[in-house]
């Protein structure tokens, strides 16, 4: 049953695989800290309004981080341009921010990621089940899932269950 759920979550986001966790919070902490272990010298670029679970995952990773101004694509580009193109980079941001409800410029961030050879990690916990033709979130609603490398979600809000996941 668990594998079936993971397969359904991967399909929901148009990704190859998904991995479930006990909560969305744990999904962010575990995924970000584990991902960094696979990418030596990685730089994490994090939106200044990211959720506490993302901040915790970044701290646990002990990776170098750079914080960009909230939804400020120009500031993000300045930070990316200052890095060697071959340095591993992960842009971590949310689709819908919990504190004020605004949405991120996903298309623009994904375009910068491609231009500067960075991975994208999009937290969709406040969007899954609410947006998109199948409830896949803002990236699905805007037709942008292919431009996102890792999507993080939760079952504990709109889906009315418990658990969190990543899909990649």
Where in this protein do the model-derived segments appear?
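Active-site phosphate-binding strand-loop segment of PLP-dependent enzymes
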Residues: 66, 70-122
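Short, structured coil segments at secondary-structure junctions
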Residues: 60-62, 116, 147
């Amino acid at each position: 049953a668990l594998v079936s759920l993971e397969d359904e979550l991967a399909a929901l986001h148009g990704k190859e695989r998904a991995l479930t966790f006990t909560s969305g919070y744990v999904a962010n902490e575990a995924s970000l800290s584990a991902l960094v272990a696979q990418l030596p010298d990685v730089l994490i670029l994090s939106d200044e309004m990211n959720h506490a679970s993302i901040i915790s995952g970044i701290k646990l990773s002990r990776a170098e981080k750079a914080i960009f101004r909230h939804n400020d694509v120009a500031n993000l580009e300045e930070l990316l341009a200052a890095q060697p193109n071959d340095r591993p980079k992960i842009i971590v941001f949310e689709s819908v921010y919990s504190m004020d409800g605004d949405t991120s410029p996903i298309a623009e961030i994904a375009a910068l990621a491609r231009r500067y050879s960075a991975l994208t990690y999009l937290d969709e916990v406040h969007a899954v089940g609410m947006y998109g033709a199948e409830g896949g979130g803002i990236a699905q609603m805007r037709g942008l899932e292919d431009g996102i490398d890792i999507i993080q979600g939760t079952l504990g809000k709109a889906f009315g269950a418990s658990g969190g996941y990543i899909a990649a």
